[in-house]
Structures are given as structure tokens and as C-alpha cells.
Swiss-Prot record:
Fe cation binds at H440, D442, H510. It comes from Bos taurus. Residues 422-529 form the Fe2OG dioxygenase domain. Its EC number is 1.14.11.2. The lineage of its organism: Eukaryota, Metazoa, Chordata, Craniata, Vertebrata. InterPro entries: Oxoglu/Fe-dep_dioxygenase_dom (IPR005123), P4HA-like (IPR045054), Pro_4_hyd_alph (IPR006620), Pro_4_hyd_alph_FE2OG_OXY (IPR044862), Pro_4_hyd_alph_N (IPR013547), TPR-like_helical_dom_sf (IPR011990). This is Prolyl 4-hydroxylase subunit alpha-3. Heterotetramer of two alpha-3 chains and two beta chains (the beta chain is the multi-functional PDI). TPR repeats lie at residues 227-260. N-glycosylation plays no role in the catalytic activity.
Length: 544
């Protein structure tokens, strides 16, 4: 019951108590005698008491709404508050999907509040869906795993890798942005609902800790409470085999909600289990991270993502070098490109400053209105999957002169025909919160792949341009080559996907590491076999 409804109910009770027939009959002539006027002071004092309680409740509610207003306003006024920070991005989605809804629907239907509700309902369809909140929560878990981040540190806004007793700062934000108990609860609950107690427990533990520290403080936007966090954490521990923790948390729950029969029954069940198996009280619960069936190279992949600049150097391998490249092309004679040979097997080259800031911005601007969830080939179909989180758009070279210039530059450097149907249109990709693409090949590995629909053979080469910089993460990791290339703004990576025999090069298995902090954009130009017969002649030797 809201403040206005409570006031109405209290006034109704007061009217009922003052409803003696004799008093009712005399109300119309109170003014006729001073003694009657004096008697009217008593009920007014009661009304004042009721109004005082109502105003105190309203003041508390308005103070809380003012707190929420200034909290959100400060984020919008601070120009140094980027959504490239995954914690800020998660809380933005949570605010729009959950917090604002709780704030708006907690208010009473007075005229000004009705206008607020109507305005909220008009924009509601444009707000993130619950699935977005789930996706953002899974992204935080992904970053937690790949970069070995400490949940307690994340809750404080700190990006730290914890290995044993060693703590490494991976990124130092200009402004710390901490998570609330409700934020941590939402992340933990997403894992909890998936039966993933490995991730659920540390997030729910942090939620419990934060809720304990602020117990009794009412926040309009919160969806969860200390009791919710204790309840979920207790069951998560029970499912993980730690009955003692489940029992202690359930007992704590009953301190705040002693009438909850379900939790009371759980306490009896846990006590019985411990009585029957005393060893469970001292046994340590070893939590194992959920296995990813399709990712057999997880440890190598994550190790490369954690190691910035893990490619070999010229000092260790003399055959790696840097040069100014013209590829004997008149187009590049007066403007050679800075070339860095990153690796030999597979052959991977990085071309520095391949595009200008203006060109990169133009390409991003052309693609942005057309971005859609990225898909991968699955048999003859193309489907969105959890192991590729990004949006992409395809741009024809006729869209803008910048794309024509780009094609000429790629052709001059590679010596390949990049015009359709011998190459695909430019694919522009923007990675989301914790955006990544787990280990994969660019070339088709199945005859039924949709790549063959172009009737121009397989993808012989990849030309990938970094259209932005990132503050942390996002490297391109070559799994079997055992090296990674960090994001270098405006640079381009080139590698061959196929041997000259037409067989796929297994060493080109690569991945886009999750973006830890930043807004990662890349552009891919995939060049096919057909049309390259005289530009890259075939060979029967497997090593070519």
C-alpha cells in the first residue's frame, strides 16, 4: 500500500471512530458554540498526527527518489563515464530493464506520477529486454573466467586478476564504479537459474555481503533483498554439496523472516543430513567451472587472451621483420604501408595505419544503422550463438567512395582480386559487452557450408582491419600458432586461410578475445579462391 493509500485508510479509520450518531447529528452546527469549536481541536490533532506520519513517509520516499535521480544524473553528466566499461554497461541495461520499472511502479497514481508512468510506458518497448540483462550478466561471468577476475574486486569497480596470492591490475578506470547488492544478485541469479553454481555462489556471496552492510536501507529501484540473496545462496551451496553453509545461511534467513515455513523445513532437512553424515560438516566443497563441450582448446585460448602482445619478437626469431611495403604496386609507390611480419607459420602480417581516423569513422558510421546479431554457419544454416557475441553489417563498395578506395588499397597490398564474386562485401563488426568469438576457422570446413553459395570457392585469405582501439582485452589469438595480436587502431591483419593446395591451414584457428574494456570495431574482407588462379598459383606441395 502506497503513502496516499495509507493516508486514505487512516482517515477512514478516524472517520469511523468519530462516527457516533449524536456527534454526526451535531456536526452541522459546530460553529454555533465555542465549546463545540474547542472539541474540534482534538480530532484535528489526531489528523495532524496522521498527516505528520504520512509526510515523514513521503519525505523518506522523496529522499530515496532524489538519491536515485542524482545517482543516474551524475553518470550522464560525467563525460568520463563510458559504457565501454562492462560494469557500467551492465548496470545501464539493468537500470533500463529493471530499476526504472521498479521506481515507476512503486509510485501512486497522482496526476504528476501518472504522467511519469505514461511516459515510461511510451518508451518501454525501446528499453532493453530481460534477455539483454541475462546476456550482460553472462558477459560479466565470461570476463570473470577468461581474465581470472576477482568478483569482490569487480563489485568495487576494480579489474584485478587473482592467481593464488598474486594480484594483477588489468585495467585502472579513471573513476571507480561499484556494484550494489542488487546488481550482484542479478548476476548471481542468472547463473543460479542456469544451474551454474560455480558462478552463482561468488556473485550471491557478494550480494549477501553488500545487503548486510546496508540492511534496513530502502532503495526503490532494488528488486531483491538480503532475504532473497540468502535464500538463493543457501540453495546454491546445497546443490554444490556444502550442506553446512546452506544450513547457516538458512538460519540467518529465519532471523529476518521467522515465519517462512519453506526455509524452516530446509533447516530441518539440512540438520538431518548433517546428523546422518557428520563428515559433510567439515568437507571442503570444490567448485568446478562448467565445461564447454565445443571448446577443446579453452586453456590455450584463455592463456593467450591474458597475455598481451604474446607474438614472437624479431630478437628471438630473426626472420620476423618490419618494412615499408609497396608490393611493387604503383598505387603504393608514394605511400608505402608499414608492414610487420608477426608470424611465419601461419603467415600473419600486421599493416600499421592502414586506414585513417576519418576513414575508420566513416566505415563505422555507414555500418551502424544496419548492425544485426552476428551468426555462424551451422550445417546449411546460419544461427546466432553464445560463443560469438557481436553485431555485424555488410557494406557494398558502391555505398561510399571510401569503400572503393579501401578495396583498391587491399588489392594493391595483397595482389589479389577483391571484387565480387571473388571476394565478399566488407563485413563490419561491433562487439558487445564482453564481446568475443571463440576459436574458429574463417574458411569452410564442411562441403555444406553456406560459404560455397557464392560459387567462388573457399575463403583463401582474411584481411581484418581494426577500426577502433580498446582499453583492455579484445586481442586476436591464434591458438595453434600460440600467439596473440592486440588491437592496434587503424591497423590491419592479413593471413592465408588455405594452403596453395587448396587445403585448409589448421594453424589459422583463431579467436577474438573478450573485450574487457572498450568499444571494439573491426572490418573483415574475405577473399575467395576463384579469381586468384594467376595471382596465387596452386601447388601440390603441402608446405606451401
Amino acid at each position: 500500500m502506497g503513502p496516499a493509500a495509507r493516508l486514505a485508510a487512516l482517515l477512514a479509520v478516524l472517520a469511523f471512530r468519530a462516527g457516533d450518531p449524536a456527534e454526526v447529528a451535531a456536526r452541522g452546527d459546530t460553529f454555533s458554540a465555542l465549546t463545540s469549536v474547542a472539541r474540534a481541536l482534538a480530532p484535528e490533532r489526531r489528523l495532524l498526527g496522521l498527516l505528520r506520519r504520512y509526510l515523514r513517509g513521503e519525505e523518506a520516499r522523496l529522499r530515496d527518489l532524489t538519491r536515485f535521480y542524482h545517482k543516474v544524473l551524475s553518470l550522464h553528466e560525467d563525460s568520463a563515464t563510458p559504457v565501454s566499461n562492462p560494469l557500467l554497461a551492465f548496470t545501464l541495461i539493468k537500470r533500463l530493464q529493471s530499476d526504472w520499472k521498479n521506481v515507476v511502479h512503486s509510485l501512486e497514481a497522482s496526476e504528476n506520477i501518472r504522467a511519469l508512468k505514461d511516459g515510461y510506458e511510451r518508451v518501454e518497448q525501446d528499453l532493453p529486454a530481460f534477455e539483454d540483462l541475462e546476456g550482460a550478466a553472462r558477459a560479466l561471468m565470461r570476463l570473470q573466467d577468461v581474465y581470472m577476475l576477482n568478483v569482490k574486486g569487480l563489485a568495487r569497480g576494480v579489474f584485478q586478476r587473482v592467481t593464488g596470492s598474486a594480484v594483477t591490475d588489468l585495467y585502472s578506470p579513471r573513476r571507480l564504479f561499484s556494484l550494489t547488492g542488487d546488481d550482484c544478485f542479478q548476476v548471481g541469479k542468472v547463473a543460479y537459474d542456469m544451474g551454474d553454481y560455480y558462478h552463482a555462489i561468488p556473485w550471491l556471496e557478494e550480494a549477501v555481503s553488500l545487503f548486510r552492510g546496508s540492511y534496513g536501507e530502502w532503495k526503490t529501484e532494488d528488486e531483491a533483498s538480503l532475504e532473497d540473496a540468502l535464500d538463493h545462496l543457501a540453495f546454491a551451496y546445497f546443490q554444490a554439496g556444502n550442506v553446512l553453509c546452506a544450513l547457516n545461511l538458512s538460519r540467518e534467513f529465519l532471523l529476518y523472516s521467522p515465519d517462512n515455513k519453506r526455509v524452516a523445513r530446509n533447516v530441518l532437512k539440512y540438520e538431518k543430513l548433517l546428523a546422518e553424515s557428520p563428515n559433510q560438516a567439515v568437507a571442503e566443497t570444490v567448485m568446478q567451472r562448467p565445461n564447454v563441450p565445443h571448446l577443446q582448446t579453452r586453456d590455450t585460448y584463455e592463456g593467450l587472451c591474458q597475455t598481451l602482445g604474446s607474438q614472437p619478437t624479431h630478437y628471438r626469431i630473426p626472420s620476423l621483420y618490419c618494412s615499408y611495403e609497396t608490393s611493387s604496386s604503383p598505387y603504393l609507390l608514394l605511400q608505402p604501408v608499414r608492414k610487420e611480419v608477426i608470424h611465419l607459420e601461419p603467415y600473419v602480417v600486421l599493416y600499421h595505419d592502414f586506414v585513417s581516423d576519418a576513414e575508420a569513422q566513416t566505415i563505422r558510421g555507414l555500418a551502424e544503422p544496419w548492425l544485426q546479431r552476428s551468426v555462424v554457419a551451422s550445417g546449411e544454416k546460419q544461427l546466432p550463438v553464445e560463443y560469438r557475441i557481436s553485431k555485424s553489417a555488410w557494406l557494398k563498395d558502391t555505398v561510399d567512395p571510401v569503400l572503393v578506395t579501401l578495396d583498391h588499397r587491399i588489392a594493391a597490398l595483397t595482389g589479389l582480386d577483391v571484387q565480387p564474386p571473388y571476394a565478399e562485401y566488407l563485413q563490419v563488426v561491433n562487439y558487445g559487452i564482453g564481446g568475443h568469438y571463440e576459436p574458429h576457422f574463417d574458411h569452410a570446413t564442411s562441403p555444406s557450408s553456406p560459404l560455397y553459395r557464392m560459387n567462388s570457392g573457399n575463403r583463401v585469405a582474411t584481411f581484418m582491419i581494426y577500426l577502433s582501439s580498446v582499453e583492455a582485452g579484445g586481442a586476436t589469438a591464434f591458438i595453434y600458432g600460440n600467439f596473440s595480436v592486440p588491437v592496434v587502431k587503424n591497423a590491419a591483419l592479413f593471413w592465408w586461410n588455405l594452403h596453395r593446395s587448396g587445403e585448409g591451414d589448421g594453424d589459422t584457428l583463431h579467436a577474438a578475445c573478450p573485450v574487457l574494456v572498450g568499444d571494439k570495431w573491426v572490418a573483415n574482407k574475405w577473399i575467395h579462391e576463384y579469381g586468384q588462379e594467376f595471382r596465387r598459383p596452386c601447388s601440390s606441395r603441402p608446405e606451401d
